[in-house]
From Swiss-Prot:
PROSITE patterns: SAM_MT_TRM5_TYW2. Specifically methylates the N1 position of guanosine-37 in various cytoplasmic and mitochondrial tRNAs. Methylation is not dependent on the nature of the nucleoside 5' of the target nucleoside. This is the first step in the biosynthesis of wybutosine (yW), a modified base adjacent to the anticodon of tRNAs and required for accurate decoding. Its main location: mitochondrion. Keywords: Cytoplasm, Methyltransferase, Mitochondrion, Nucleus, S-adenosyl-L-methionine, Transferase, tRNA processing. This is tRNA (guanine(37)-N(1))-methyltransferase. Its EC number is 2.1.1.228. It is found in: Mitochondrion matrix; Nucleus; Cytoplasm. Residues 61-83 are annotated as: Disordered. The lineage of its organism: Eukaryota, Fungi, Dikarya, Basidiomycota, Pucciniomycotina. It comes from Puccinia graminis f. sp. tritici (strain CRL 75-36-700-3 / race SCCL) (Black stem rust fungus). PANTHER family: TRNA (GUANINE(37)-N1)-METHYLTRANSFERASE, TRNA METHYLTRANSFERASE.
Length: 510
């Protein structure tokens, strides 16, 4: 692991972790998002990173001196507390930036320039050096006109705070200790430090957490922070080189296509993003589709349940997080559809980007109709050129519209019956070792008894009892907490034969 990280330009694994945490902590979503997004490393699982860092930090050989952060000046004027809507939102100005200028008194060791590396790497001197991210511990000596001397900045303005062992080394080499100052300005401090120092004292939670989607930083600001939304956006934009656009989610949700309305806070009005996840490339207009990077782990988990050459029907495919993974990584055949024309356009684009034209068939339309059409399409239209060219039957149905997914499950009633007279269909169903798996994402407010609540609702719509004891391959998987007393789950089970032939006697014939 260390060789891989060092080759990216880091001196050691521990130095990398310091760099990652200091540069990326603002990219951790405030509602529990577990991904870190950094220019150096891409996406990292926060839990894995923390575990790895704890292990590595216990190794003495990799221990680094603790890094010091200078707080912003105490005399910065905080912004006034303004009820939303009473006055124009406050924006970042040059006058605000100027308040962050500060001169910090320090001591420095005046060292001959040819010996600077020798003294800087001396263990007794290193522990007394200034060690702060984005600050150099070596500066030119203003009193040395011929550059014969340089200054090693120490971490204190008081000589009695320098370790005796460090002073001894300086004395042995006749090194002068002199007063100097460290000039800091707006560029030194990180976004959360700036925002915390500027906001009114009454606002105690710092709204510096956001979701990264490509080059877009996506906020969900509470009402009390709206008067400062443009300032927050501008600070985030200036302090994160990878960010080109900062937006804030508006409460309004497009009722038909279920994507969030958003407003531009800072940067370019460019909402077309390109990103990589699990070896797949995605491009889409974030302002016109629904996409949640917090579900990346679940996308991977569900995809791992799909075997090579299985058939997947993704009726609410969005931009294709399930469809692309299933086809590219699992070598499955996928029918992907969505009601939103922008999602369909993104699906077609992503199929081309990942060179999956032969494995993913894209269409647009209502999810219920696409579920009902899927079996006929696979059996009669043969949309894929499979090795044995036989008609296909579905192995997986993915229903990912959590707010209303369960309402669509009536589409599975009698799903197979229309093809019962088609030549070879019943025999093919009989020969198949397993019936299709349904993967349905949904919300529940019964957080203490999710299984009872979800199974009851699913059973009522399907008019068949769905429970761990009545269906095969049952699983109820917690996905994430959405809000207090509201969780997201995935219910997975094998569709019962009596459901697929619910209005006929074909069940017994199959």
């Amino acid at each position: 692991m260390e060789e891989e990280l060092i080759c990216r330009g880091f001196d050691s694994v521990e130095v990398l972790f310091v760099d990652v945490f200091e540069k990326s902590r603002l990219s951790v979503g405030g509602d529990g998002e577990r991904m870190l997004q950094t220019p150096q490393t891409g996406s990292l699982m926060l839990s894995s990173l923390l575990t790895t860092r704890r292990t590595i930090s216990s190794m003495a050989a990799l221990q680094q001196p603790s890094r010091h952060r200078f707080p912003p000046p105490n005399n910065i004027q905080r912004l006034p507390l303004r009820p939303d809507g009473q006055q124009e939102p406050i924006k970042l100005t040059e006058a605000i930036k100027q308040q962050f200028k500060q001169s910090i008194p320090l001591l420095a060791a005046r060292v001959p320039s040819p010996s600077i590396t020798k003294f800087k790497t001396n263990p007794e001197i290193r522990k007394a050096l200034l060690n702060s991210k984005n600050l150099r511990s070596v500066e030119p000596d203003p009193d040395s006109t011929d550059n014969a001397f340089k200054l090693l900045l120490l971490n204190t303005p008081h000589k009695d705070q320098i370790p005796e062992s460090t002073l001894k080394v300086f004395q042995e080499h006749d090194i002068q200790i002199k007063n100097t100052k460290l000039d800091l300005d707006w560029e030194y401090w990180m976004a959360d430090e700036i925002i915390e120092r500027l906001l009114p004292d009454q606002l105690t939670d710092i709204p510096a957490s956001f979701t990264m989607i490509g080059h877009i930083a996506h906020f969900n600001l509470r009402d009390e922070y709206l008067p400062y939304k443009y300032l927050i956006g501008q600070v985030i934009l200036e302090k994160n080189l990878a960010i080109k656009t900062v937006v804030n989610k508006i409460d309004n949700i497009n009722s038909q296509f279920r994507f969030f309305e958003m407003e531009l806070l800072a940067g370019e009005p460019d909402y077309t993003v390109t990103l990589w996840q699990s070896g797949c490339r995605y491009r889409f207009d974030f302002s016109k589709v629904y996409y949640n990077p917090r579900l990346s782990t679940e996308h991977d988990l569900l995809s791992s349940m799909i075997e090579k050459d299985e058939v997947v029907v993704d009726a609410f495919a969005g931009v294709g997080p399930f469809a692309m993974r299933a086809a590219a990584n699992r070598k499955a055949w996928v029918l992907a559809s969505d009601l939103n024309p922008a999602s369909v356009e993104a699906l077609e684009t992503n199929v081309r980007l990942n060179k999956l034209q032969g494995r993913v068939a894209v269409s647009g339309g209502d999810g219920r109709e696409k579920i009902r059409e899927a079996v006929r399409t696979l059996w009669l239209d043969k949309p894929f050129k499979t090795p044995n060219s036989s008609p296909l039957l579905p192995d997986h149905f993915i229903i990912n519209l959590p707010d209303s997914s369960i309402q669509f499950l009536d589409a599975f009633r009698d799903l197979y019956h229309p093809l019962s007279d088609s030549e070879g269909f019943l025999n093919a169903v009989k020969k198949k070792s397993r019936l299709p798996l349904l993967h349905c994402y949904c919300f529940t407010k019964q957080v203490d008894e999710p299984e009872s609540d979800i199974c009851q609702r699913v059973s009522e719509v399907m008019k068949v009892e769905i429970s761990p004891s009545t269906v095969a391959r049952f699983e109820l998987k917690f996905v994430r907490a959405v809000a207090p007393h509201k969780d997201m789950y995935r219910i997975t089970f094998e569709l019962p034969l009596k459901l697929l032939f619910s209005s006929s006697s074909e069940e017994s014939r199959a």
